[in-house]
Amino acid sequence: MKTLIARHKAGEHIGICSVCSAHPLVIEAALAFDRNSTRKVLIEATSNQVNQFGGYTGMTPADFREFVFTIADKVGFARERIILGGDHLGPNCWQQENADAAMEKSVELVKAYVRAGFSKIHLDASMSCAGDPIPLAPETVAERAAVLCFAAESVATDCQREQLSYVIGTEVPVPGGEASAIQSVHITHVEDAANTLRTHQKAFIARGLTEALTRVIAIVVQPGVEFDHSNIIHYQPQEAQALAQWIENTRMVYEAHSTDYQTRTAYWELVRDHFAILKVGPALTFALREAIFALAQIEQELIAPENRSGCLAVIEEVMLDEPQYWKKYYRTGFNDSLLDIRYSLSDRIRYYWPHSRIKNSVETMMVNLEGVDTPLGMISQYLPKQFERIQSGELSAIPHQLIMDKIYDVLRAYRYGCAE
């Protein structure tokens, strides 16, 4: 990460896409997409997804590292080209506890990530805990971030410190996505970004972390990009020029969250304006979802009724029976909630792919389709971009490859924006 940031600060148009997903097919696609390039791939886990207690994936940081490395070995992607990152590392998961208890767990969280070899650490102590004022004072946020940084430094080896990098700041939506419709978004003021940097510098120095400050590579701000269930707020470069100019006088770049669904031109403009780390998550699993839904429609037409997976019906039934991952995000009417379950850009389906019933139904569908020849006309109907690539010889009509290529479409846009 440090080399990439140095190249960007030296004037190169270079950025990196941060893949924020624990889905094995998304990780496989991210690694396979860059297998034949010289680029490194940044894969991040969030604190609620992966933590010392397992998170909602059931994985500790060490488990997640091995999970990613196993996929890399299968794909033929060199492990040393993978950068592992931890996102929103702080009290996010324990906000209902008092600050002392939440920070104690947060310290162990950060240590677990660093011990597992994660080298990009987002120190995010912005969340109010039980008994805290809302919002927290910037000084309190910075002081808690310094506590987390001290924890990271205390377990990092000398070799790890050479690679270790920190991201500070948190002008981002609640991890997991927006819970309501959005009409506009607040772009970070330069004064607020400067204050974030100033308070963190002061807090780090007070804790004897002057050297660690040299490892702070980025600050999270809001450049004016966001999405909800059916709306996308697109990047308007002219609105972020003050931010773009301010960061040029520092050693850092910006990290932009929720960049999903922007245009490839927007990604290029974001990187040009020094938002050099572009986070993406739901757009990748949304592309996966589109591919699986398309293949399910093809299965419906090609496979005898008694042998079909019933994949779409299984997904719907499981999500209606177990609504904990979407209930507070989606609309309440039955028809509206069904539309959101299927097609929301927030893509809450991503939390359900590991469910045994859904996983088994998708596997059945894949086996069914691997045993038949899919007419090109059907691929054109349901996966038109992939049809064009089949016609040009770039792609084969194998179900797994069709899913991969659908995810590649998202990665292609980021590659354009981050291109060296």
Curated annotation (Swiss-Prot):
Pathway per the UniProt entry: Carbohydrate metabolism; D-tagatose 6-phosphate degradation; D-glyceraldehyde 3-phosphate and glycerone phosphate from D-tagatose 6-phosphate: step 2/2
Family statement drawn from the similarity comment of this UniProt entry: Belongs to the GatZ/KbaZ family. GatZ subfamily.
GO cellular component: plasma membrane
GO BP term, pick one: phosphoenolpyruvate-dependent sugar phosphotransferase system
Name this protein carries in UniProt: D-tagatose-1,6-bisphosphate aldolase subunit GatZ
Record keywords: Galactitol metabolism
InterPro entries linked: Aldolase_TIM, GatZ/KbaZ-like, GatZ_KbaZ_carbometab, TagBP_ald_GatZ
Task of the protein: Component of the tagatose-1,6-bisphosphate aldolase GatYZ that is required for full activity and stability of the Y subunit. Could have a chaperone-like function for the proper and stable folding of GatY. When expressed alone, GatZ does not show any aldolase activity. Is involved in the catabolism of galactitol.
Subunit structure: Forms a complex with GatY.
Organism name: Escherichia coli O8 (strain IAI1)
